[in-house]
Structure formats: C-alpha cells, structure tokens
C-alpha cells in the first residue's frame, strides 16, 4: 500500500493498494453469468446455443478456422447471445460486461443468426463461400442499402466483401443473395 499526500503532489491525495486473490483463474463456459468452467476445446457435450453455432460454423467456415476458434477461445453464453472470449480470460461472473469477447451471434428458434462483428473479423480464406464485389459498384451500394442481388453459386451463407474487405453476411438461395447487413448500419 502507498499513500500519496496532497502536499507532495498535484491533486487531492490518494491511497493505493494492490490486492491479489489466492487461487487459480478458471476459464469457463458461462450461461447467464454462471460459470461452468468448460473451455471451448474441452467442450464434449455442447450446450444450447453452441450446438447451433457449431452447425452454422461447419457449413460456413473453413475447417481450419473452426478448429482455430475452438483452440484459442472459450464460449460464453449470456441469454441468447453467444461470444468467444480470449483464452485465459478470467471469469466475468458478477460483472456488467458490454462484450466479453467476439460476438458470434444470436440463437433464434433453434438456429444461429451470425453477428456482423463475426463477419468483420473473418478473412476471405476463412470461409467456404464469398461474394467479392467492387467497392465502387452498384451491387455493393444496393447491399449496403439493404437490397438483394442476383448471384450464381451454391446455396448457403456468404461473406460479402468489397474489394477483399469483409462487409457483412448474405444468404444465397435460388440465385438471390438475401441481405443480412444490420438494419442500423444501412445507408438510406
């Protein structure tokens, strides 16, 4: 501990103490703030939300990307929101945390709705399907405004890119790329 007297420095004076809690930090799978202590790499029986994410990831990501996520992080679930916390992150139990890691998505009706943050964190080689559009073209402008566009390819989730940079998600079905760009970010 140390005392910083007001007559010896500018300010009102301060008292500093370093507290150290004995014991080990536990990584954990968190559900509604309750720590379960299951690192992502050791997750044998995934909980609700993680199953949906893994199904989405198997169809969308390159296999090495999925293995890298599970190796380097811990799944955290708060309500219907799923996050990937960095490896070694201490428990957030009892804390109000805005984002405890990379937001992977939201579980809705037994399916995973992937987050925009995840799309922006990915690179072209980390996903199975991409739609790389010219940044000065009408198609990307329409996408950023919330519109759909025609696209040829296999049915599934696509990482929409503008000149090689991730922009968001799209879902191809029947030759039409459905827009999954966040409504709050769309241009008018």
Residue ranges of each PLM-predicted region?
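A C-terminal cap/extension of S-adenosyl-L-methionine-dependent methyltransferases
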Residues: 1-11, 20-24
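Polybasic, low-complexity RNA-engagement segments
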Residues: 14, 22-188
């Amino acid at each position: 501990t140390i005392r910083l007297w007001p007559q010896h420095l500018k300010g009102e004076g301060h008292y500093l103490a370093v507290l150290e809690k004995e014991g080990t930090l536990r990584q954990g799978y968190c559900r509604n703030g309750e720590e379960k202590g299951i690192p992502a790499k050791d997750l044998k029986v995934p909980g609700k939300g993680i199953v949906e994410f893994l199904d989405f990831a198997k169809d969308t990501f390159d296999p090495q990307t999925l293995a890298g996520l599970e190796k380097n992080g811990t799944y955290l679930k708060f309500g219907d929101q799923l996050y990937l916390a960095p490896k070694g992150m201490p428990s957030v139990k009892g804390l109000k945390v805005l984002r405890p890691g990379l937001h992977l998505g939201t579980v809705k009706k037994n399916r995973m709705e992937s987050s925009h943050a995840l799309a922006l964190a990915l690179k072209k080689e980390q996903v199975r399907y991409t739609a790389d559009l010219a940044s000065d073209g009408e198609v990307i402008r329409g996408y950023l405004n919330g519109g759909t566009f025609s696209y040829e390819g296999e049915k599934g989730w696509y990482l929409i890119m503008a000149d090689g940079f991730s922009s968001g998600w799209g879902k191809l079905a029947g030759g039409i790329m459905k827009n999954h760009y966040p409504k709050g970010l769309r241009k008018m």
